[in-house]
Amino acid sequence: MSLLKRLCLLVGLLVAAALIYLLLAPTKIDPVAWQPPAAPSLTGPYQQNSRLSSIQRLSLGEGREPEDVALDNAGRIYGGFNDGRIMQLQADGSQPRLFADTHGRPLGLVFDSQQNLVVADALKGLLSINPNGDITTLASEADGAPFGCLNDLDVAADGTIYFTEASNKFPMKEFTSDILEHRPNGRLLAYDPNTHKSRTILRGIHFANGVAVSPDQSFVLVNETGKYRVLRVWLSGPREGQSEVFVDNLPGFPDGISSNGKDKFWLALVTPRNKVLDLVLPHPFLRKMIYRLPKFLQPKPQRYSFVIALDTNGHVVENLQDPSANCFAEIANVVERDGTLYFGSIGESAVGRFSLH
């Protein structure tokens, strides 16, 4: 056999092996079919614009992916790196210093009424950090089972902590697996500071993400990233305990959400909808093939800056974007303080600041 024929045979065998792998190799995911609604165009309430092109970057020091951002009563700024460190900045954005180290993955950050920083840590559970940086574990399980991947949280006026478990199957480093599988592996929980117990509020969420309690404390919002929507769970009144869709068919993946304490919820769309993902969501077999591809060949999130504000009825009242994302990209959380927005990100090493005036 000539050298050329041998090479052709070798290439053919390699191609056949690759096809067999893509078609038949076992996977961790067990996807189900879902037909997503057609993505809304970037017109009308989502009209494309470049208002976020002037975001100011505030360096936290050496580190990556400060997903959430929180401010204490003195205006100091906090962000959590992916290696467990939570950094603090002065109110003017200067003097980064280590505030605490969870040795986990701090994702959700919010201050309670006593100025303790409450943390949803994907690896360590629900934590409380006092102003001196001392860490206390509030909870690591609910309903007799340890937490999966905790994601975000908010604290109600009565001290109840509402928080999400993004997935009880996949760790945060494999969050794309949960999105590809598209099973309702997430839930919303509540921690009672009086009993020190956690309980499940809502199950069956497709990648449970951001959490925000309404200004009047009558409901809590939870982002369902896998279905491009925000859910509302009533906490009081005649519909107490019931859930409903608050806003549906978003133009991007909803990540963090926060209340401004008055009349708005700020919602971070971490990246626009992915056309390839929307095309394969109805086809579990194709999603298994994508899962088997090397990471560098799998669909990637688009670098984009996208934040909207919703009123208490779920209507879009603010629309801030930057398609170039030259200043700041992949905004994962947004907090308003005195007419200024502060951003966390899964694609940056800094937090962001933007004046609304």
Named regions from a protein language model:
Residues 2-357:
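Sequence-structural signature of mature extracellular/luminal beta-sheet repeat domains
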